[in-house]
Amino acid sequence: MSKDHLDFPHVYKKNKVLKLKPLDLSKNPRSYYFSSQNGSIQAIINHCNNINQITARNWLKLSKVLSYFGLEKDTSDSISKNKSPFNRFLKDISHIFREGEGSTKKASELGEILEKIKNLDLKIENLNKRIPDNLVTKALIKELVKDFDERLTEVRDDIKKVIG
């Protein structure tokens, strides 16, 4: 690759370089200041606007990259693959941040899950009670196999002595 590919924002996928357009095309690079001499309401509003602008620009860059990889659809981009998540995010964003939205559903689901966990615990305890204490363990099986092998070799040796 040549150096000019590295000078601009880009994504490399499947032997193809997609050049991304920078979001601020002005000749003067943007600068954001988050400290001020006075603590007025206007200074706070300016800071919030700066944060909002940075967040929006970062979200837009991220959505462009995700749309290229097919994880999100940007309707303005012909390379994007999946059309529904991008539009759905914009429609559902007002519902996402509502206070208390869906909390009753989550509480009832958690209650059901907790009940299922308790039932499974009871079943496990019942199964543990059914298991006898004098189970054959792997170590005991290994000892038995080793003892059997020793006896078998003794029998072979005795047969060889008799046959001659």
UniProtKB/Swiss-Prot annotation:
Highest taxon of source: Viruses
Protein function: This protein is involved in virus transmission.
Family membership noted in the UniProt record: Belongs to the caulimoviridae ORF II family.
Name the record gives this protein: Aphid transmission protein
Organism, scientific name: Figwort mosaic virus (strain DxS)
Lineage of source species: Viruses, Riboviria, Pararnavirae, Artverviricota, Revtraviricetes
